């Protein structure tokens, strides 16, 4: 009987210990949830001040060939646009309105046609953010206005791993100069017939930027020759390295006297490829790219009825369920992952990662932005 009482007392002690552990665990979870809610509230309050319409009406333009394939990201962009007061335009290739058909109907390549259609949509807003359908805003507290420079007509950014001026996303002002820039780019699909390795509209864009900013004709001819003779990716990136060096040298010699096109440094823009950090992201990121495989979870939760409330935007997409686990990291962690990606890219593309190139500075710049 005494032994039974002892066992009973021991059992109660274990039960009390277990309850204490559960309470402690729940308390930790509640504290973390409160902290996340406070951070989200802070980001929202900051965004209310940062997203004032300083540059007029902002539009987000998506050209998607398979709307059902990108249902999740398109819905996410709609939530973001509605929360910021931006307009959203989703256009399907070869199903555009009559204005677009009249102006762009002769352009067969979707990669070039999309820039022509974007030019037609320009007159609906003051600034247009062109984005790929497989991209999405991961932090709603970031604003398009952060990246607008009113001294320029077109704003590009350099892609981190390749050194290319990115063709898949750009900011463009509603102006005759911008419209001509996009239409001229769109009309250059014929160039691909002369090139073996061209990367579609990306390769053409590198030369288009150089011509627009007024790079020396001899330098242009040198880069064109590299482009025309490229027979492999090695040759293509030698061409990209040529255009990158030419743009950097032109900036040094001429400054920014011709304020037409601005090219932001890698990670200095609004978008980066999500695979660079293995799917991880931070509060610093704005738009993540290359979400081609959109699972049922994303499609289910990222829809208009489930848009976040105004006080719960930052991190909303990833607080909905298992997708969040292990993906949001500190800026330190992301910087280490980016440094690793940079070393890998430098081995594969030495012509792009040369001394003095902007790519060699971006990881430290990303790390320095943690307080912003």
What residue spans do the PLM features occupy?
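Short coil/turn segments at secondary-structure boundaries
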Residues: 71-76, 93-94, 142-143, 168-170, ...
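Structural recognition of the beta-strand scaffold that forms the well-ordered cores
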Residues: 89-90, 129-130, 154-157, 169-171, ...
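Conserved donor-nucleotide/metal-binding helix-loop-beta segment in metal-dependent transferases, i.e.
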Residues: 135-176
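Solvent-exposed loop/turn segments at secondary-structure junctions
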Residues: 66-67, 95, 135-137, 160-162, ...
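Extracellular/periplasmic catalytic domains that process cell-envelope and extracellular macromolecules
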Residues: 51-55, 122-123, 147-149, 161-165, ...
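Short beta-strand-to-loop acidic/aromatic patch adjacent to the donor-nucleotide binding site
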Residues: 118, 125-136
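N-terminal anchoring/stem segment of glycosyltransferases
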Residues: 2-125, 176, 327-372
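Catalytic core and acceptor-binding pocket of nucleotide-sugar-dependent glycosyltransferases
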Residues: 115-116, 177-372
């Amino acid at each position: 009987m005494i032994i039974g009482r002892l066992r009973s007392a021991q059992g109660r002690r274990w039960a009390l210990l277990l309850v204490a552990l559960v309470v402690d665990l729940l308390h930790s979870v509640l504290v973390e949830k409160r902290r996340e809610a406070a951070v989200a509230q802070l980001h929202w309050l900051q965004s209310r001040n940062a997203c004032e319409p300083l540059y007029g009406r902002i539009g987000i333009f998506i050209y998607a060939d398979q709307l059902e394939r990108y249902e999740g990201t398109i819905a996410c962009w709609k939530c973001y646009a509605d929360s910021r007061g931006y307009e959203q335009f989703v256009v399907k290739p070869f199903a555009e309105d009559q204005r677009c058909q009249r102006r762009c109907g002769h352009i067969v390549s979707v990669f070039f046609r999309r820039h022509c259609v974007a030019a037609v949509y320009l007159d609906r807003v003051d600034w247009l953010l062109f984005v790929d359908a497989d991209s999405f805003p991961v932090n709603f507290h970031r604003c398009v206005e952060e990246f607008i420079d009113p001294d320029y007509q077109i704003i590009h950014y350099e892609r981190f791993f390749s050194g290319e001026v990115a063709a898949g996303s750009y900011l463009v002002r509603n102006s005759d100069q911008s419209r001509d820039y996009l239409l001229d780019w769109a009309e250059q699909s014929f160039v691909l017939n002369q090139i073996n390795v061209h990367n579609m509209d990306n390769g053409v864009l590198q030369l288009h930027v150089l011509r627009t900013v007024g790079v020396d004709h001899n330098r242009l001819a040198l880069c064109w020759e590299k482009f025309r003779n490229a027979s492999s990716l090695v040759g293509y990136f030698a061409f990209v390295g040529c255009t990158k060096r030419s743009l950097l040298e032109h900036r040094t010699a001429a400054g920014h006297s011709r304020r037409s096109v601005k090219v932001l440094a890698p990670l200095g823009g609004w978008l980066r490829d999500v695979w660079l950090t293995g799917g991880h992201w931070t509060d610093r990121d704005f738009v993540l790219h290359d979400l081609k495989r959109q699972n049922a979870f994303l499609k289910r939760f990222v829809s208009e009825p489930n848009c976040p409330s105004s006080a719960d935007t930052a991190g909303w997409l990833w607080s909905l369920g298992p997708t969040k686990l292990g993906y949001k990291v500190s800026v330190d962690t992301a910087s280490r992952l980016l440094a690793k990606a940079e070393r890998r890219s430098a081995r594969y593309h030495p012509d792009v990662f040369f001394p003095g190139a902007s790519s060699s500075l971006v990881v430290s710049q990303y790390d320095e932005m943690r307080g912003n």
